[in-house]
Curated annotation (Swiss-Prot):
Pfam families: GIY-YIG (PF01541). Belongs to the UPF0213 family. This is UPF0213 protein SAOUHSC_00458. SUPFAM superfamilies: GIY-YIG endonuclease. InterPro entries: GIY-YIG_endonuc, GIY-YIG_endonuc_sf, UPF0213_domain. PANTHER family: UPF0213 PROTEIN YHBQ. Residues 2-77 form the GIY-YIG domain. Gene3D superfamilies: GIY-YIG endonuclease.
Length: 82
């Protein structure tokens, strides 16, 4: 069974980026090579600060969308609670 992840990275400017990946470590490396999202491309390096694992892509994408609606403060609380 495949694993699906929602992750948050902290960018060099202190901002937070939320994304989805099947392989979080490879995705973070991709962000740091400038091959990830446009948002992170100009905010490198990024550091993984949070991740959640799901059994299905659908669950992970729903959670990614939910987290993307959070305020910065709510994301920081989520990171701190883990």
């Amino acid at each position: 069974m495949d694993s699906h992840f929602v992750y948050i990275v902290k960018c060099s400017d202190g901002s937070l980026y939320t994304g989805y990946a099947k392989d979080v470590n490879a995705r973070v490396e991709k962000h740091n090579r400038g091959q990830g999202a446009k948002y992170t491309k100009v905010r490198r390096p990024v550091h993984l600060v949070y991740q959640e694992m799901y059994e299905t892509k659908s669950e992970a994408l729903k959670r990614e969308y939910e987290i993307k609606t959070y305020t910065r403060q709510k994301k920081l609380r989520l990171i701190k609670e883990r």
